[in-house]
Amino acid sequence: MGRGNITEERQQPITNPIKEYPDCFGCGQDNPIGLRLNLRLDRDRLKSSFVPQKAHEGWPGTVHDGIITALLYEIMENLMYRQGVITMMRGMEARLRSPASVGKKLMIESWMEQRSGREISVHSELKDEDGKLIAQG
């Protein structure tokens, strides 16, 4: 799958796509312990970034795998919500490729791969600021 440079002009910021849920762990801006993701739509992909803090640590200096998985989950669920589809995740597979460092910016994106009836296949990737693949969902 090819990657291209993203220009600001094509991106549409989404302040909080689920306004009726300001305490959402992923995108809610009122949740003091949440991820507070700021989302932006780039054509058919939903993107965000996140800088993990000490509170998100597992092994010393490394982001907890549960936080990595939560980031993948949130970006996929929010993609569907943004497209007007309310979903219930039937299953999720997270492939952790490399450790992520606390304090280092992470880039997250999701896209719909396939839709067949009620079945929707959504994918996500999480990379560090240098472009290194951290995880896939």
Please place each PLM-identified region on the residue numbering.
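Non-catalytic linker/capping segments at the edges of enzyme domains
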Residues: 1-55
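HotDog/MaoC-like acyl-thioester-processing domains
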Residues: 1-16, 100-102, 113-137
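Hydrophobic core residues within well-ordered beta-strands of beta-rich domains
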Residues: 35, 44-46, 88-90, 106, ...
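A conserved, well-ordered hydrophobic junction motif at loop->secondary-structure transitions
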Residues: 47-71
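Hydrophobic residues positioned within well-ordered beta-strands of beta-sheet architectures
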Residues: 48, 92, 108, 122, ...
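Hydrophobic beta-strand-centered segment that forms part of the acyl-chain substrate-binding groove
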Residues: 74-107, 112
